[in-house]
Amino acid sequence: MDRELVRTVKLATKNHAGVLFRRAVRHLPHIVAVTALVAAAPRLSTLLAAAAAGGSTMRWARALWSDLAGELGPSAPALAVACWAAALAAYTYAASRPRPVYLIDLAGYKAPREHEASRAKTIAHFGRCGRFSGESMAFQKRMLERSGLGEATHFPTSLISLPVDMCLRTAREESHAVIFGVVDEVLRKSGVAAADVGVLIFNSSLLSPTPSFTSLIVNRYGMRPGVVSHNLSGMGCSAGIIAIDLAKRLLQVHENTYALVVSTENITLNAYMGNNRPMLVTNTLFRVGGAAILLSNRAADRRGRAKYQLIHTVRTHRGAHDQSFGCVTQEEDDAGEVGVSLSKELMVVAGEALKTNITTLGPLVLPISEQLRFLATVVLKRVFRADVKAYLPDFKLALDHFCIHAGGRGVLDELEKSLKLSPWDMEPSRMTLYRFGNTSSSSLWYELAYCEAKGRIKRGDRVWQIAFGSGFKCNSAVWRALRTVDAAGLDAGDNPWMKEVDMLPVDVPKVAPIDETSYQIPN
């Protein structure tokens, strides 16, 4: 039995044991209550007689105790202690249960029309920058034709004006527009005052100024001095789920409060203006975007107000492997130009991270039949050296909607095949890539908003969000819809898709040639 099998079996066993333990403990109060009823049943006549005679609850209890003491004799005190211990255990369990975390509402940023850039406009502006060689321009054009992006993704003004203005001032302007736009919207939609927010988490991987963006939000919205704030940077496109997981953990500690999570990425300072091919890919994929998510642990919010309940978060970090650690890096080229380099091993690394992540997630959500099939193929392959393909569980048996990080067409194609998903399952991710491009950690929320705008979300549905990011990380979140989201009740101010949702989906060819004559830069 090789080490890979041992590791897989150990992990699966640990996950199953954890699930079984949680299920047993979850029903502990019911077990204690039923046990007490069974024990009291033979003395029901005593209780009824005491009740008929009138008197307080304590009198009934004394009557029951006298009856028991007469039967048990010297062992009665021990039984009393055992009963009190059971009651204390039940209370302790109830007090220590994880607090449910609810998603009240979300907002996705949609830049004004003047920020829209067709693919022809994008190539034209790249050409006028004067920094790219002819070979680099041809490469970016080929990548853009195969990227899956549409004709109305958004760039910051700094990159579609001439000359290009990449500086800290314009980077702040871009981030401020996104942050204030989504925070204003989510607070308006939810009706929650900024002063009521107890936890604030912000993530932006490539821009982390001083004061931090969390301080900017606290200052702008006049949040209370006791707000618990965290500013995450350098964590890549999977940072949105990391922020949700962190918020979940903080909401276990801070009672009866709201958590505001803001996810975005800055494009201005991270466009690459050199000629190193691995660093040019990001120019063709990343676009302006951001999202704000309002969470709550208030029990009152579950009834009619919250949209979803967070069921699971699973985080996988493969940074211990050099290949995984180095496949997405921010660096300088030989000319001193800064950019993000994507290695050729990215797809392999992402596949390994996904496999590790779903090995942990599977026992939490999949039916036992699927888990046994998966384990059986591992044993056949590793122990008996049988020539069988590794069995990938059918997650559609447990999950209804899939929001996969819109990192690029290649990533989506690979996951569609690996997870055996249908075009309908992939539609939210593909349309997000087409309409908004790769918006980094916020892409998952555009995808969920797409599902809502299409009227897909029904009460009880489960949504799986899957994110990949540098490091290398693969993170998952599973949500359960607490109510049906009525698409007819949404307007353009509630959802970034509403103005065009009826025109989607569209067919996106694998190669869509760019007609450079369709756009001319004004003189």
From Swiss-Prot:
The membrane-topology field of this record reads: Multi-pass membrane protein
Reported impact of residue 406 to V: In sfl1; screw flag leaf phenotype due to increased bulliform cell number and size, reduced plant height, flag leaf length and width, panicle length, and grain width
Reported tissue expression: Highly expressed in leaf sheaths. Expressed in leaves, flag leaves and panicles.
Q: What GO molecular function annotation could you give as one example from this UniProt entry?
A: fatty acid elongase activity
State its location(s).
Membrane
One GO biological process this protein is involved in is: fatty acid biosynthetic process
Q: Which domain of life is it from?
A: Eukaryota
- The active site is formed by 237, 317, 401, 405, 438
Asked if the record carries the keyword Electron transport, the reply is no
Q: Which reaction does it catalyse?
A: a very-long-chain acyl-CoA + malonyl-CoA + H(+) = a very-long-chain 3-oxoacyl-CoA + CO2 + CoA
Q: What does this protein do?
A: Contributes to fatty acids elongation. Plays a role in controlling leaf anatomy and plant architecture.
The entry's protein name is Probable 3-ketoacyl-CoA synthase 20
- Organism, by scientific name, is Oryza sativa subsp. japonica
- Which gene is transcribed and translated to give this protein? KCS20
